[in-house]
Structure formats: structure tokens, C-alpha cells
A protein has these predicted regions:
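Conserved catalytic core of two-metal-ion nucleotidyltransferases
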Residues: 2-27, 70-130, 149-246, 252-288
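Active-site nucleotide-donor binding segment shared across nucleotidyl transfer reactions
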Residues: 21-54, 58-64, 217, 244-245
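Conserved SAM-binding loop
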Residues: 66-68
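A short secondary-structure junction signal
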Residues: 131-137
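Short, His- and charge-rich active-site/binding loops that engage polyanionic ligands
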Residues: 140-141
Length: 288
């Protein structure tokens, strides 16, 4: 991906972020920068120069409220709330807000008839199970959820998990069966309330992230950091979180690793994705 394209993506995502922040402030929803966006805020006061996406965390209660409030009160002509359900498969276990006036088709979902606008990715933070057995069960259900919800061979959980996933998909090929499995798994893994748990955890994402436990106070409140000239919330315990995930997060990675991570099959930031239905995505579908 070219530097100019990356810069344009960042400009679009900043606009989306500011709208999202305005919406969350209005409806008293908590969120924080995470991933590259968090490192960018702390190390660069904005985007990492080569980063082509923006990820957010929300406590599970706020994450679920967002799903209810967005369709009612947001500008849905402009931005769509997206999340895998019985009828739409995004091949991503989290949620997203997508810009309807853009096109950004990820290779892993190019066959799906879904919203293919540029995305602001959102992942929940959940209450962590307190005991060893309950925690092991929570992780088991989290991996089951990820497997059947995302419905693609994982590239961030190791080769053994990837091989096992391929076998399981062959056995459970029915979309209806997969849906009921991940819905049940989701209920089991999220039964520990975020607000009353002593620790919290990421149940969506990499296997490394799933295994980590964070003090609840690190995520209970926010501090604001400069991000491209705007004050954006990050979790109060961002330093401990970043050290745990990345170690020396202020150290720049080797030059060869400073590349955009998304594998886009096609991108056009000036044209609504629906214009490309049947051409660059859902090619077995006729245009309306």
C-alpha cells in the first residue's frame, strides 16, 4: 500500500473516530484506543506513520449498548454498525463502524455480501473468570467463539490452532450449526460482569491477548492523550498494558516491519462500496 493511500486512510479514520467519540460522549459510553492507535497516541501523538487501521476497546456493557444505540441515533446513512450475526459474516470476531461512502475490501471477506466500507474496529473488554478452572473454561469458550464466529483460518493463534480449525470447519460445515455454537460460547465466556470483576481480559483477538489478565482498575477509568491534535481517551493503566503486550513500546520496530497490516483485495476511498457489488465482492451476486 502506498504512503499516500495510507495517509488518506488515516484521514478518513480520524474523521470516523471523532464522530464516534462525539456519539459515545453523548450516550455515556466508555471506549479507549488500543493496538497501534494506542501506541501511536503515546509514541507519535497520533497515527503510527505506516498504520492503516484504528482499533478501539469498549467494556462489554458499553460494547453491547453501542449495538442497541447506533441504529437508533447515529448517522446510519454515513456510518454502519457491523457485527457478525445469523445473516452476515464479517470473518472478524469484533464489531466495527464502517464508512458507507468508501470501499475497502479485505481479501478474507471479498466473497461476502456485507458492508465493505473502511472500518473503525471495536473489541470488547470482559470480566475475567476468578478461579483456575473457571478461567480455563472461559478461555475454551473464547476460542470456540472465535473459531465459529470469525469462520476463517486464524493467522494470530499459531499453526496448531490453524490446523485444528481447518479440520473443525470440515466437520461443522452448516452455517446454522456454527451460529448456534458461537452464540452459546459467547454467553458462556461473557458471564463475568466487567464492572464487578477484580480483573478483566481480552477474549477477542490473539491467543496471547486472551491469556492475559489485567487489573480492573486499569480499565475502570480513562485519561486523555493527544491524537492528531485531539484529546482521545485511553485506559488509565495504558503503560502497564503496553509493557505487557509489546515490552518496550517506545522503541521503533525494524524498518522491514514498518508496513501496513491489512490485506486489501481492493480499495477506493472515494466511491461507496455498493458500486462494486458483484465486481470486487460478492461476485456471484447481481447488482441491484
Amino acid at each position: 500500500m502506498s504512503t499516500s493511500m495510507t495517509k488518506e486512510i488515516q484521514e478518513k479514520e480520524l474523521t470516523m473516530l471523532l464522530y464516534f467519540k462525539e456519539f459515545c460522549d453523548k450516550h455515556n459510553l466508555r471506549f479507549y484506543l488500543c493496538g497501534g492507535g494506542l501506541i501511536g497516541a503515546i509514541r507519535h501523538n497520533g497515527f503510527i506513520p505506516w498504520d492503516d487501521d484504528l482499533d478501539l476497546f469498549m467494556p462489554r456493557p458499553d460494547y453491547e449498548k453501542l449495538a442497541e444505540l447506533w441504529p437508533k441515533y447515529a448517522d446510519t446513512e454515513r456510518y454502519t454498525y457491523c457485527r457478525t450475526d445469523r445473516h452476515h459474516i464479517y470473518h472478524d470476531a469484533g464489531a466495527s463502524i464502517r464508512d458507507n461512502n468508501t470501499t475497502f475490501i479485505n481479501r478474507h471477506s471479498m466473497h461476502e455480501d456485507i458492508c465493505h466500507g473502511l472500518a473503525l474496529e471495536i473489541m470488547p473488554i470482559d470480566g475475567c473468570a476468578p478461579g483456575k478452572i473457571s478461567r480455563a473454561l472461559q478461555l475454551m469458550w473464547a476460542m470456540t467463539f472465535a473459531l465459529f464466529n470469525a469462520q476463517r483460518l486464524p493467522d494470530n493463534k499459531g499453526p496448531m490452532y490453524r490446523a485444528l480449525a481447518g479440520c473443525i470447519y470440515k466437520v461443522f460445515s452448516s452455517q446454522s450449526v456454527r451460529y448456534h455454537i458461537w452464540r452459546f460460547a459467547e454467553k458462556q465466556m461473557t458471564k463475568y460482569d466487567f464492572n464487578t470483576s477484580k480483573e478483566c481480559t481480552e477474549l477477542i483477538g490473539s491467543l496471547k491477548g486472551m491469556k492475559l489478565r489485567h487489573p480492573q482498575e486499569d480499565f475502570a477509568s480513562v485519561v486523555y492523550k493527544d491524537f492528531e491534535g485531539h484529546q482521545i481517551p485511553v485506559m488509565k493503566g495504558y503503560e502497564r498494558y503496553l509493557r505487557l503486550i509489546w515490552g518496550d513500546y517506545m522503541q521503533l520496530p525494524p524498518v522491514e516491519q514498518r508496513v501496513a497490516k491489512h490485506d486489501a483485495a481492493f480499495a477506493d476511498l472515494h466511491t461507496p462500496y455498493k458500486k462494486y457489488r458483484g465486481i470486487y465482492y460478492a461476485q456471484n451476486k447481481a447488482q441491484p
